[in-house]
């Protein structure tokens, strides 16, 4: 990996990112116990959100792994104009408030414009910057200024060391609570590849590193009018990433992904498969971190 020389300083007037970031009662730290970000691709309905959050809360409490619940009110980056995008902010944000109160769960959702950051922030614990927006300076600054924890997906077009500049835009805006997420790199047409060397490189930046096990198996635009995916490789990649050592894993899951209204059905893991996967990942994590 021909990594270019990167200056030691993050950026003028920038602070270093926090190496340990706490969201609710969940700790993300590259040296601490593995944490989980999980939930369905899209917010489908209040009832579905409650069903999923309840099931994941029960599972993670039993296993002893910290959970941040994720879901998206809008999926703006779709292959087709006619693709399902989600219920929208007006329907989803009040339910996010309910989920936080009912289940005592921190909630993560993604934002797609600068204006959305301040609107969404009061209703969630983590603002997520989508991969295709990871270089948008105004977007990163607007998110940072909300004071919320920021999770930035690494663009499929970025080298792992390029995330240093992304993180610097956030810390330089006064927010040191940043998570960085690896979700694969473009590899020719309609496919991604996960380079596990990216994980320690990103860890050198100083922020907790997350591995997105479900979007990493995505085949962008692979079905013509929508994206495909190879769900069978989710566990393979997740195990590899956790064996390297990460702060957390990101997994989209659903009771019936093949018949869901969500856009990432081919990538999502069936909810019934989550217990066995998490048990194995936690075992890998204990070995990787010598715990």
Language-model regions, residue ranges each:
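Glycine-rich, proline-tolerant flexible connector loops at the mouths of alpha/beta enzymes
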Residues: 36, 40-49, 67-89, 254-264
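Active-site-adjacent loop and "lid" segments of alpha/beta metabolic enzymes
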Residues: 82-90, 103, 126-133, 189-196, ...
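Catalytic beta/alpha-barrel core
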Residues: 87-88, 102-116, 125-138, 149-160, ...
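Catalytic alpha/beta core domains of metabolic enzymes, predominantly
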Residues: 146-253
